[in-house]
Amino acid sequence: MSGIGNKRAAGEPGTSMPPEKKAAVEDSGTTVETIKLGGVSSTEELDIRTLQTKNRKLAEMLDQRQAIEDELREHIEKLERRQATDDASLLIVNRYWSQFDENIRIILKRYDLEQGLGDLLTERKALVVPEPEPDSDSNQERKDDRERGEGQEPAFSFLATLASSSSEEMESQLQERVESSRRAVSQIVTVYDKLQEKVELLSRKLNSGDNLIVEEAVQELNSFLAQENMRLQELTDLLQEKHRTMSQEFSKLQSKVETAESRVSVLESMIDDLQWDIDKIRKREQRLNRHLAEVLERVNSKGYKVYGAGSSLYGGTITINARKFEEMNAELEENKELAQNRLCELEKLRQDFEEVTTQNEKLKVELRSAVEQVVKETPEYRCMQSQFSVLYNESLQLKAHLDEARTLLHGTRGTHQHQVELIERDEVSLHKKLRTEVIQLEDTLAQVRKEYEMLRIEFEQTLAANEQAGPINREMRHLISSLQNHNHQLKGEVLRYKRKLREAQSDLNKTRLRSGSALLQSQSSTEDPKDEPAELKPDSEDLSSQSSASKASQEDANEIKSKRDEEERERERREKEREREREREKEKEREREKQKLKESEKERDSAKDKEKGKHDDGRKKEAEIIKQLKIELKKAQESQKEMKLLLDMYRSAPKEQRDKVQLMAAEKKSKAELEDLRQRLKDLEDKEKKENKKMADEDALRKIRAVEEQIEYLQKKLAMAKQEEEALLSEMDVTGQAFEDMQEQNIRLMQQLREKDDANFKLMSERIKSNQIHKLLKEEKEELADQVLTLKTQVDAQLQVVRKLEEKEHLLQSNIGTGEKELGLRTQALEMNKRKAMEAAQLADDLKAQLELAQKKLHDFQDEIVENSVTKEKDMFNFKRAQEDISRLRRKLETTKKPDNVPKCDEILMEEIKDYKARLTCPCCNMRKKDAVLTKCFHVFCFECVKTRYDTRQRKCPKCNAAFGANDFHRIYIG
């Protein structure tokens, strides 16, 4: 009877009817095979025997049906394999055909310049490979997907249209597709022919000799190539977009395939397990059925009758013990209970396994999604993140410092190169300037020589001309010599007055320092009357000198002629001595200048080396510099006075000697300057060579700066010398003109001497000159006083600057002290922080070690818990088995203890009949018989319950919750 629950194969059609034999048996009801039932004592026994025979016949029919089902299943599997191969081949053909059409379309878009992409797409079929349609409502997920996709437009593929169409429609559609492919190929051929013709035409135009045709061909070719380039660009963009979408779809499909493959493998394993279980149960059922059939045949063939404790069969020798039969029934019930318990346990284990698998999947999903969050929430990750942020900020700072250092390096290199280039340019320009100046000096020397020759010729001519005016000139020279003597006397007096004035000024300064402003006013009031007698004394002396000069001129008129020659000789000798003295003075001045340059260089070097010294040394140096400047100022004043005296002597000398002396002096001066410049040029070239060798050193740079300053100083000095030379030349010209004027004036005077007294005129002129000299001395005195005041103001300003610098130095020293204190505090704090960091690192290491130990203990505890749970489950299993054994043994004990209470065979059969009826009734409504089976799980219910569940969209099995669709249930017929 257990064979009623056998399941149908999945590939069997749902609406199939039972065989004709079965239907005929049900319809007729009388064409039943005759069976011997043996001796029957009551109607109940008759019902029991009829039911037993029906059961045996049903078992035979079920065996036959099962064999038929196996054959049909094999046939269906063959057909499915064949259909799968046919579908695969169709899919391959469709895919390659669609790829062929796609390639043709791309080639047409590539080469067809007249046809657009839209025209091509209208002719083309949708050649997408269809996805295999899922079984309708196979499970809840597919049902939900189908319900979700009901609103979307269906994407009809070529194979889907073929599958849904008849044979004639299929042939027409295939013909249309072949025709479209043929048209596309013919279009490619025509496009290729057009391109070939166009290329041949362009080649003919290019090969033709006409320039206009060649230019037109080139322009046409350029436009064609540009258009082709645009089309290629569009095509590449389209293909790239398509490749991107296809790659995305491929990745999605690949993930789906992987999930489907994993699911298929799981389902296959489940199917194998279930198939093995089904085969096992079927074999057991067949064995029991055969055994039961044999027993029934024996009983029916020989007949039997039960008597109390034992029974004997009429017409045979076999006896059956009723007690043994009851024991067998009890064992059967126990076995059923055990089987039911085992099934319940297996169901529980299966549910537990499903729950564990679902939980495992959920945990996997959560692990995939929540691993990052968990890792981010860990303290180690946060610590690493903080360390990373700190290191990243430090790396950014170091990168910024590196960039700044690189920029500074590049800037310093650029500035260094720029400075070197500027120095080289300056050197080249200075060399050029020196060369040009040397050339100019040589030119001027040549010009001076020429002028000297011209002047010498003129001098000879003037000598020849002046021999006639000799006596007049001698008289004039005698007068000029007397006037010069008188001027010397006046100058001596002036010098004496100046000395007195300096002494008075020094006394005045002392008294000013002692007494103050009141005494200054008294001194200024006392100086005014002193100046007046100083002015009156020369007037009286001038008058006395005039009177004495007039007397001497009258008395010595005869002696003048005899002494003129001697005076001329003495003058020439004096002039030579003066020229020698001038040359010596010039040489001394040059030596002084060189010494000054050396001293200035030494002072610069010492200033550079002692920049970090104290301010007291600076004050001393400033005082020494001021003293040197005062000494130089005195020397300059003395040289100025000497130059004035020389000018007076030049003016007093005759024109011929003066011109000669001037020319000789100019020639010597120019020669000396030329030699000096050449010597300087050689020195500069030597220095340049040395400095070029030592260009990289800082000493070389310092020397270059010193040489540049020296060059600037020499240039300034040379410019000053040129200016002085030009001024002297201008003064010489002025004095020459004045001398000529004096000659004319002397001629007039000689004419007037006859009419007037020459002595008065000379005395008056000398008095005017002395007054002018006195005025000049006053002006010089005022200028010196102004210079002294300016020097004082400069000294005061420098003292204020020194004070400010000292204050700044004190402030900087205090700032340095505070900075050092702060630095010490910060270093202490840094050391404390380092110690704290070390302690924190040690604590972290200790905590890590403790954490590892705790994790190890936790793992050990978990392993122990798992082992304990496993042992507990084993103990529970053993306990259940022991309880079952105890219950079984108790039942045996009860049966052995109470043999009288054993029920009769009729009651047992009635109970079995009730059990079978209960099994044949639907478990959902408990009213109707089972006449429908679910092909997904092979559970049997009544057709009305299944239909109502399908109509109310509760499409799940009431027992196992397996989803089913419209094609997943059908009727069955149980006789």
Curated annotation (Swiss-Prot):
Positions of the UniProt region annotated as Disordered: 1-30, 125-155, 507-622
InterPro entries cross-referenced by the UniProt entry: E3_ubiquit_lig_Bre1, Znf_C3HC4_RING-type, Znf_RING, Znf_RING/FYVE/PHD, Znf_RING_CS
Expression across tissues: Expressed in the normal brain and also in malignant gliomas (at protein level).
Keywords: Acetylation, Chromatin regulator, Coiled coil, Host-virus interaction, Metal-binding, Nucleus, Phosphoprotein, Transferase, Ubl conjugation pathway, Zinc, Zinc-finger
Pathway: Protein modification; protein ubiquitination
Gene3D superfamilies referenced in this protein's UniProt entry, alphabetically: 1.20.1170.10, Zinc/RING finger domain, C3HC4 (zinc finger)
Biased composition (Low complexity): 543-552
Coiled-coil regions, chain positions: 43-90, 168-375, 429-898
Residue ranges covered by zinc fingers (RING-type): 922-961
Positions where N6-acetyllysine occurs in the chain: K21, K348, K510
Localization of this protein: Nucleus
Entry's EC annotation: 2.3.2.27
CDD domains: RING-HC_RNF20
Phosphoserine: residues bearing it: S41, S136, S138, S522, S562
Its biological purpose: Component of the RNF20/40 E3 ubiquitin-protein ligase complex that mediates monoubiquitination of 'Lys-120' of histone H2B (H2BK120ub1). H2BK120ub1 gives a specific tag for epigenetic transcriptional activation and is also prerequisite for histone H3 'Lys-4' and 'Lys-79' methylation (H3K4me and H3K79me, respectively). It thereby plays a central role inb histone code and gene regulation. The RNF20/40 complex forms a H2B ubiquitin ligase complex in cooperation with the E2 enzyme UBE2A or UBE2B; reports about the cooperation with UBE2E1/UBCH are contradictory. (Microbial infection) Promotes the human herpesvirus 8 (KSHV) lytic cycle by inducing the expression of lytic viral genes including the latency switch gene RTA/ORF50.
Family that this chain belongs to: Belongs to the BRE1 family.
PANTHER family reported for this sequence: E3 UBIQUITIN-PROTEIN LIGASE BRE1A (PTHR23163:SF2), RING FINGER PROTEIN-RELATED (PTHR23163)
Stated name of the protein: E3 ubiquitin-protein ligase BRE1A
Gene designation: RNF20
